[in-house]
């Protein structure tokens, strides 16, 4: 994995920032729930794969068909790293309420960036870049 490769190069986990986008946020939360990192950034995160399945296929028995390993809402409290959650309120793929719910459940220190107009793919405008820079500069081991 990338983490093991970086550790082989002498980089410690507390010097790494995990970044997950959309489906990748489930993996980032899973990994961050097991070890402390310098920080975690989640872009357009979902609460669980089952929640997403129920949203996309409301007519199917998703909880029976899908065994969910990526229960981000259940695991977010185990994340002990500083966290930045970014989610566009106009997201038409992963509902905004999922990112907001994860933010509400996350431990401090935490930062949010919830622009009204952004959809699933965030616009990397001046405000978002400023938020990222401020978050990264607040991390102690970078």
Where are these regions (language model features)?
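Primarily recognizes the serine-hydrolase "nucleophile elbow" in alpha/beta-hydrolase
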Residues: 5-57
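Short beta-strand/loop motif that positions the catalytic acidic residue
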Residues: 78-80, 85-91
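Mobile cap/lid helix-loop segments that gate and shape the active-site cleft of serine hydrolases
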Residues: 38, 45-81
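Short alpha-helix in the alpha/beta-hydrolase fold that links the catalytic acid
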Residues: 72, 81, 95-104
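Post-His helix in hydrolase/transferase enzymes
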Residues: 123-138
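Acidic catalytic loop of the alpha/beta-hydrolase fold
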Residues: 89-94, 120-122
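Catalytic histidine neighborhood in serine/cysteine hydrolases
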Residues: 100-123
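Alpha/beta-hydrolase-fold serine-hydrolase catalytic core, especially in secreted/extracellular enzymes
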Residues: 140-142
